[in-house]
Amino acid sequence: MFTNEEAGSPYGHNNPKNINIEDVDKYTLSDYGLTVDAVKLNHFGVSVTDPRTGEFLPDAFYESKIEAAVSQAEKMLDIVILPRVLTEHHDFYSNDYNSYAFIHTFHKPVLQVEKITLEYGTGTLYRYPTRWWKVYNLPGHLQIMPNTLLSGGSDGLSLAQAYQGNMPVLSGLPASGKNFAPQMFHVEYVGGMLPPSRRGVTAPNEMHPDLWNMIIKLALKEVFEQWGRLIIGAGIANMSIGIDGITQSIDTTQSAMYGGASADIVQLNEDIGKLYTGLKSYYGTNVGLI
């Protein structure tokens, strides 16, 4: 049984350090420009107020819809945005293991990996050396490539020893022809993305400008839905007021089936659809085969 306990930094050219662990929970949506003012700027010229009282839509409403839009975007694209420390257990499959222990993390993008270990039961059997890790940040893929020399470093493990038989020899178990074992791989990493650091330049570990745009438009949809109900009242298509022979008539596109801002919402849906297509291509699609 191998019990490598290699110490030192987990970061290197194959796993760059993008964020300090102690700073992970300090990032907020405002750091990414996802603010109330950003949403209001995108409905410039449209005053979202209650016509009876003149009261503006409160900022708390905008904030809740921004949070909902972020959650919706994460589910649509199968990504995470705010940085977070994640701990996962992955099953052993012989085909994946023979492909340099391929692991597809449950969340993406991956900002940096902290630890990859092999477990059996409740114990750690082997901690993979940092220099073996191959990290593909954007799709959330990890692979392990041992040193190809006869001696793989301080642990004295060679490539032939690391990939012998159908079961991971590193576990200390004999090769038994099994193709599956549950939760043998333990992975700790930081998932999410960082705010843009330079205008006009998109880095893989930073928020894509199209993603920011889509989130704002998702939040804006909720604002326009509320505004459509406020124009003259929910479900009212037209209204007339007469005082001392002076009349005023207001006709809208609103009906019992459609709100007053339906046309704006249709346009937003088209914009969101186009942004989604491009972002889905950028972040990729998670495909699972059984």
Locate predicted features.
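Protein-protein interaction interfaces in oligomeric scaffolds
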Residues: G242-S262
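Short conserved catalytic/interaction loops centered on acidic-Pro-aromatic/His motifs
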Residues: Q226-G242, I246
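Conserved short "hinge" loops at termini or chain/domain junctions
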Residues: M1-N213, K217, Q226-R229, M257-I290
